Amino acid sequence: MEERTRAYLRGRFGDVYRRAEIDLPPRADDREWGYIPWTAGPDTTMVRHKSTLDLGSMTSFLERKCPRHVYFSAGTYDAPGAATMDEKHWQGSDLVFDLDADHLPRVTLGEDSYAEMLSKCKDALLRLLDFLERDFGFEELTVTFSGGRGYHVHVRDAGVYELGSEERREIVDYVRGNDLALETLVEAEPVGGRGLENPTEKRMLPADGGWGRRVTTRLEAFADDLIERGEDDAVATLTEFDGVGERSARAIYNVVADNTTAVKRGNVDVHPAFLTVARRYIDETVAAEQAPIDEPVTTDTNRLIRLPGSLHGGSGLEVQRLDRAALDDFDPLVDAVPETFVGHDITVELPTEHTVELRGESLTVGPGVSTVPEYAGVFMMARGTAEKATE
């Protein structure tokens, strides 16, 4: 990034911060703070181990430093400004989740557009919230658009505040569906009947919640589809499953047709051949419904995370706290564009042609010097695809 570009962005970030109203996280004085300035060179060095006492008021700090990125710690400490983690004396931490398009299995880097990546990341966010709200019962969630290519979720609950890294890793494993298998998911239920010397058991997926609910929902749709197809078409479909021949396929179809209610309730012991189907649907459910969060962010109790209301130095977009009810309608490429950058044109220079999708419009510019809306120019300069041209 050229010095002219860096100076321009620093100045305009400062203009945003002079108008901004920043809401600090709870217990802000007990948290570590850090920031990345607009320094020259390819490497970005974070200034960290700061407390609010070191920075002064957040408003004056942002106006004075105009930082490229601003962070606060998930953890709270007795001495947040101490130079080492041992000296800080950890008290507890928010439970933080990070979803980034770079880590999503459904995103194809180099092929998906920025807008497509954000859309897929939002889908993953909704799946994560389903886990946190329905499975864990968390009520107080703070959802934030990262300003880049993803979202952050903070859980501030007394029940998770003092969890260590290993306990947090168990939560990661759950929402990612790590190592989820039929044998660990099913629950044994006794089979009733008078006069049984040796009572038997049947294995059931717990359909009332958790991963069992998700798998059972898909098995319900599978059973309905199989019956609707009819035997011959259903057998042809089932033989496409690994390890299922025609004989097993007919057995599966017949057992589903004859025991539809049991299958929909999650009974996987209706027939030995049905176990193959159940295992397949567990794998499919995990692939479709897991939340591919970034594990190190959640397990690191000292993690620094972006400050809502600040700007992301790699995009010029706002790190924006989101109301849960408004999440469905939120479009980051429209709603996170700072108003300070709207209504002005600037000149930028690009080495190659580049397309930007912002504020509901698609703009193709370059190569060479072009006049563009400032919000588009800031976005391209921050992402390193353009430099500031002389006006």
Curated annotation (Swiss-Prot):
<feature type="active site">
    <location>
        <position position="294"/>
    </location>
</feature>
<keyword id="KW-0479">Metal-binding</keyword>
<keyword id="KW-0235">DNA replication</keyword>
<keyword id="KW-0460">Magnesium</keyword>
<feature type="active site">
    <location>
        <position position="98"/>
    </location>
</feature>
<dbReference type="GO" id="GO:0000428">
    <property type="term" value="C:DNA-directed RNA polymerase complex"/>
</dbReference>
<dbReference type="InterPro" id="IPR014052">
    <property type="entry name" value="DNA_primase_ssu_euk/arc"/>
</dbReference>
<dbReference type="GO" id="GO:0006269">
    <property type="term" value="P:DNA replication, synthesis of primer"/>
</dbReference>
<comment type="similarity">
    <text>Belongs to the eukaryotic-type primase small subunit family.</text>
</comment>
<dbReference type="InterPro" id="IPR002755">
    <property type="entry name" value="DNA_primase_S"/>
</dbReference>
<dbReference type="GO" id="GO:0046872">
    <property type="term" value="F:metal ion binding"/>
</dbReference>
<dbReference type="Pfam" id="PF01896">
    <property type="entry name" value="DNA_primase_S"/>
</dbReference>
<dbReference type="GO" id="GO:1990077">
    <property type="term" value="C:primosome complex"/>
</dbReference>
<keyword id="KW-0804">Transcription</keyword>
<keyword id="KW-0464">Manganese</keyword>
<dbReference type="GO" id="GO:0003899">
    <property type="term" value="F:DNA-directed RNA polymerase activity"/>
</dbReference>
<dbReference type="InterPro" id="IPR023639">
    <property type="entry name" value="DNA_primase_ssu_PriS"/>
</dbReference>
<keyword id="KW-0548">Nucleotidyltransferase</keyword>
<feature type="active site">
    <location>
        <position position="100"/>
    </location>
</feature>
<keyword id="KW-0639">Primosome</keyword>
<protein>
    <recommendedName>
        <fullName>DNA primase small subunit PriS</fullName>
        <ecNumber>2.7.7.-</ecNumber>
    </recommendedName>
</protein>
<keyword id="KW-0808">Transferase</keyword>
<keyword id="KW-0240">DNA-directed RNA polymerase</keyword>
<comment type="function">
    <text>Catalytic subunit of DNA primase, an RNA polymerase that catalyzes the synthesis of short RNA molecules used as primers for DNA polymerase during DNA replication. The small subunit contains the primase catalytic core and has DNA synthesis activity on its own. Binding to the large subunit stabilizes and modulates the activity, increasing the rate of DNA synthesis while decreasing the length of the DNA fragments, and conferring RNA synthesis capability. The DNA polymerase activity may enable DNA primase to also catalyze primer extension after primer synthesis. May also play a role in DNA repair.</text>
</comment>
<comment type="subunit">
    <text>Heterodimer of a small subunit (PriS) and a large subunit (PriL).</text>
</comment>
